[in-house]
Amino acid sequence: MAPVSNETFLPTEAWGEATLRPSFVRDEDERPKVAHDRFSDAVPLISLHGIDGARRAQIRDRVAAACEDWGIFQVIDHGVDADLIADMTRLAREFFALPAEDKLRYDMSGGKKGGFIVSSHLQGEAVQDWREIVTYFSYPVKARDYGRWPEKPAGWCAVVERYSERLMGLSCNLMGVLSEAMGLETEALAKACVDMDQKVVVNFYPRCPQPDLTLGLKRHTDPGTITLLLQDLVGGLQATRDGGKNWITVQPISGAFVVNLGDHGHFMSNGRFKNADHQAVVNGESSRLSIATFQNPAPDARVWPLAVREGEEPILEEPITFTEMYRRKMERDLDLAKRKKQAKDQLMQQQLQLQQQQAVAAAPMPTATKPLNEILA
C-alpha cells in the first residue's frame, strides 16, 4: 500500500523504497556506532525469585549496584504471566499490521492524550525517529480515556488493562527495593510519587532501507521514576555509561524486562543512581517490537532528594514539581537541538561562501579584446 501522503507517511508503508526519506536522516554524530545485533551481556541480569523472602537483601544489593553503575538492568522471575506477555506482543503486532487508515483513526498529534503517532508526540523535533507508536495513559485509572484506546485488534484493550495492572505491581515492588537501598522505608519512593502515573508505549520499528542513517529512537534519558521495557529478540536497545563514547546493544532475553532508572529516580537518590542513557537502532532485515511502561510521579509531586548521604549536598537547588522538572528537561532538549541546527546551518553557509571564493580565485583572468578595426587591419 502506498503512503497516504507526505504528512501521514508511515514507516510500515516504506517497503520497496530504496532510500530513507530526508526527514529521518540524522547528523553523522548521531548515527548508530554499534550494530543492532552485536549483543553485550554487560547490563546486569537479576532474578527476582525470593524477592519477598530470604533473597531480598541480595536482590537489593544487586539492584543498587546496577543503578549506580548503569542505571539499567534486566529482571527475570518477575511474576508477570508468560501468556499475558505473549498476548500483549501478538496483539501489538496485529495492530501495526493494520491498514494505515485504521491506525490513523487514533492519531494523537495536536496534543491528544493517547493513541497512534509516527516518531514522537513531542513538538519541534528536527529529525524524525524511525518508529510507529501507540500510547496508553493507563494510571490513574480515573483519568483513562478509553476513546483513545484502539478497538482493533479485538481484545487488545482488555489485555492492555491486565498488563498495566501487573506492571504497576512489579514497578512498586522494584521501587520498594530501591527505597530500601537508599536506607528508607519500603514505601518511601512510591509515597513520593503521590498518585502514580503510568503510561504504556508500544513501539514498532519497521525494517529500514538505510538503517545506518537513522535511529528508531534518539538518545535520551526517561523523565520518570523507572521504566520497564519488554522487547522481542531482534535487538536494538542500546545503552552508554560514558556520555556516548561507547555504546552496547542490550542482549534480548525472552520474557525479561529491562528496567531503566529515569531522571526522577536519579534526583530522588541525589544522583547516587544513574538515569539510564539509551537509544534504539533499527535494521534492514526485520521489524522490532518493544513495549515501554513508564512509571512517573503525579504532576504536582515534589521533586527533591529523599536521601542525602553524609558529606553530600543536594543536587537540586530547590524543590520543584515533576511538571516543572519535565518542562525544564524538554526546554533544554529543544534548545540544544535548536542551537545544534543553527551551528550546522552556519557551517554550511561558511562552506558555501568558501567554495564561491575558491571558484572566483580559480577562474581564468579575462583577456583584453582588440577593437574590430585593429583585428581587420
UniProtKB/Swiss-Prot annotation:
Residues 193-297 form the Fe2OG dioxygenase domain. 2-oxoglutarate binds at R288. Binds 1 Fe(2+) ion per subunit. Keywords: Dioxygenase, Flavonoid biosynthesis, Iron, Metal-binding, Oxidoreductase, Vitamin C. Its cofactor is Fe(2+); L-ascorbate. Pathway: Secondary metabolite biosynthesis; flavonoid biosynthesis. GO terms for molecular function: flavanone 3-dioxygenase activity; L-ascorbic acid binding; metal ion binding. It catalyses: a (2S)-flavan-4-one + 2-oxoglutarate + O2 = a (2R,3R)-dihydroflavonol + succinate + CO2. Transmembrane segments: none annotated. One of its GO terms (biological process) is flavonoid biosynthetic process. Pfam families: 2OG-FeII_Oxy, DIOX_N. Fe cation binds at H220, D222, H278. Gene3D superfamilies: B-lactam Antibiotic, Isopenicillin N Synthase, Chain (2.60.120.330). InterPro entries: DIOX_N (IPR026992), IPNS-like_FE2OG_OXY (IPR044861), IPNS-like_sf (IPR027443), Oxoglu/Fe-dep_dioxygenase_dom (IPR005123), Plant_2OG-oxidoreductases (IPR050295). Its EC number is 1.14.11.9. Catalyzes the 3-beta-hydroxylation of 2S-flavanones to 2R,3R-dihydroflavonols which are intermediates in the biosynthesis of flavonols, anthocyanidins, catechins and proanthocyanidins in plants. Belongs to the iron/ascorbate-dependent oxidoreductase family. This is Naringenin,2-oxoglutarate 3-dioxygenase. It comes from Hordeum vulgare (Barley).
